Structure formats: C-alpha cells, structure tokens
Amino acid sequence: MARFGTVLFQILAPLQLTLVAFLAALKAASAVAQEKDRGTLILLLMTRMSNTELVLGKLLASLLDVAVMLWVALPIFALVVLFGGVSLEAVMRVFAVTFATMLVAGSWGSTIALRNEKTFQTLAWTAMGIVLWAALSEAIALGLVAGQVPSAAIVGLAISPASAILAAARPSLETTGSFAILGNGVAWYLLATLSVAIGLNLIAILRIRVWNPARESRAAPAADVSPRAGEPVEAAPASAEEHITAAAKSGRTVWHNPILWREVMTRAYGRKMILIRLAYLLIFALTLAGLYATISSGDAFAHRSARDASLPAAARPLAPFFLISLVIVNALAVTSITTERDSKAIDLLLVTDLSPKEFLFGKLGGVCWVTKEMILLPIVLCCVLWASGGVTLENLVYLIGSLFVMDLFAAMLGIHCGMHYANSRTAIGVSLGTVFFLFLGVATCIVMMISFAGSFESQ
C-alpha cells in the first residue's frame, strides 16, 4: 500500500500542477481580454483607481476560483497519506509549489492580456509562453542546453515546474543543516517564481496606461468641416470626388461565403499573427529536437518491464505539443465567436441574408485555415516517428486520423461554446477547460494503467 500511495501521489501532483498553471493563466488572460473586448477597460482607466489596484485587483479576482479549487483539493491529497509512503510535509511542499506556479502563471496571463489587443493573440501567447517555460526549463534541468554539469541541474530545478513538483513529491528530501532552506531546490523554485511574478506585475503596473488604449483604438479626431451659421455651403473639390471614386473602384471581390472570405483573406485576428506562428514554429523545433534525442538514444524503442513501466519516452515531447496545438485551435474557434458578440457585430450578421450553414461552415473553415500549422505540424512529427521505426504504418494511420478528429472536435467545441454562452469569459473557460480536462484526464488514466501494469488490483 505504501508503494501504491507513493506512485499515486507522484501522478496526482504533476496533474494538479498542470491544470492549475493553465487554468490560472487562461483565467487571468480572459478576464482582462473581456474588459478590452467590451471597451470597459478604458472606462476603468478613467476612474480614480490606481494602476496597482487595477492590475492586482483583476489578477486576484481571476485567480480566486483557482485558489478555491486548490484549497478544496488539499483534504483529498491528505487522504493519500493514509496509504503510507507520503508525509504531510511532502503534501505541503507540493501545494506550495503549485500555489507559486499559479501566481506566476496568472501574472503572465494578465500581463500578456494587458499588452495585446486581440483576445486570440492573448490566449495563444499565454498558452505558448507556459509551454515554452516548461520545455526550456526542463531542458536545462536535464542538461540538454548547458550540458551535464551540476550547476545546470540546480538552475533547472530552481526554474522548472516539472522538476520542482517531482522533487517536492519525492519521499526522501534532505532538510538537515543550517542552510537547509536555501539549499533546498524547492525553496529556490519558490523564490524564483515569486520574484518573476512580482516582476511581471510591476511591468504591468508601470505600462498599463502606455499599452492601453492600443494604437488601433487611438483614432485622430476628425476635423470640423461643417459650415458655420450664415456661411454658404461650397461644393466639394474635384480632387475629393476623384478620391472617392478611386476608393470605390478599388474594392475586392468577395467569395460566395463572405464569412469564409473574411477569415481567410483579411487580417481578422490582428497584425501579429506572424509572431504567433514564429513562436509556434520554435516550439515545433524544440519538440522535434526532443524527439530526435529520444530516437538517437534508443529510449523510443526500449521495452521496459511491468514494474518499471511508465509513459513511453517518445510520447513525452509529443504530448505537450499536441496539447498546445489543440488549445490554439480551440482558442481561435471560441474567440472568433465571442469577439463578434462583444463588438456587437454578430447582431448585424443576424439581420443579413447569411444562412446558419454559411456562418457555421465559414467560421469552421476559417479556423482550420488560420491554424493550418497547428493541424499539419503534429502530423509531421508522427511521420518522423514512423520513419524512424517508432510506430508501424497502421499506428501512423490511427494517429493521423485521431489528430484530425481531435482538431475538428476542438474547433467545433470552441464555436459551440462561443455561441451557447452569452458571457465571453464563461465561454472561453468552458471551452478551454473541456479540452484540458479531456486531454489530461485521458493521459493520466493511461499513465496510471501503465504504472500499475504489474497489479490488476491496483489498476
């Protein structure tokens, strides 16, 4: 029973950390993005509220639900102590690491939301930032960046949430000595994350009135060209008429489905989409490097015993990349509807001659086109794994088919939640939360089945 409690605790602790980190970041980001979409953030800036009250107030209010969920989970983790193999000190360490990660993830999401104008850009940058943080810090902890040196492992433990949560959940953690607190890697992680959270909030406090309103919203006041009382009304100059005529002739041909045309042919999601694609390509390169290292070392083809069974080595770099791809597809789908509603544009679309089929399939096709990299690049990684002999051709077909189904499900789920929930924050939370819970829930179930492969009773 002690081994069962230890393994169960080491599975639940990273799961809770992952959920809390992503939920905190996305809730904080969506809370600020909703204020921007509705135009109420500018009204808040015009009040007597200070920058500190505005930034910290929005952050703490958005993290309240996540903190309550974390508090409710504490008694459940305490029950694991009854199985043996886990101490209350380990539970406290795990919750301290999780709470610090929640603060830094929420601060990152809030700062990014205050910086960006479009909701999709905010959610994409938030999710990719969390993944990059986890991937790069874990690479440093494993010695893949700075080499196998002792200092790299110490620095990696201080900045890597995965290494910190595993160190906190480890039963044997030395705490002796006069400098035990400073020498503890978990303590260094807490110090580093709290410092980063304070730094992010300071940047947001100092720059909130510089970033907001954005340049796109700062329209120059129009000149007063109305005639005064008693003055004759003169005709418009010929140059103005020629300009109007030229502007009228320079229109573009709209497709039969105007919704699809707008999604594909215009910059409907802002001018910074190229930066999001570049960041995603960076994550793809890191994932490809991790997969190549796994294949080169032979870990991707290693067969372990039932007692030492764990998640396959090739799945470790691929699973986070697949998750972030689904999250971006889902985020674009739900924000494509919520942005239309918050800007009151959907009311105008409802009075046109557009059919529901044109609107739905136009949005769905636009989401698939804009996120084509997030749909195709995971398939490329699967093909690389097949070419190296990691999977058979039959399994490759199943992988590609499953990815297409999951991408379509994520896109349709986002559109459904955006249309079903009137509140944008609720729609975004339900949509992204469903993707996270389904993906991580199934992955955790698989890990538990593999970890307890030697005991049917434990499974």
Where are these regions (language model features)?
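Transmembrane alpha-helical segments and their membrane-interface loop/helix boundaries
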Residues: 1-23, 30, 65, 69-72, ...
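Helix-loop-helix units of permease transmembrane domains in multi-pass membrane transporters
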Residues: 31-63, 259-264, 268-269, 337-369
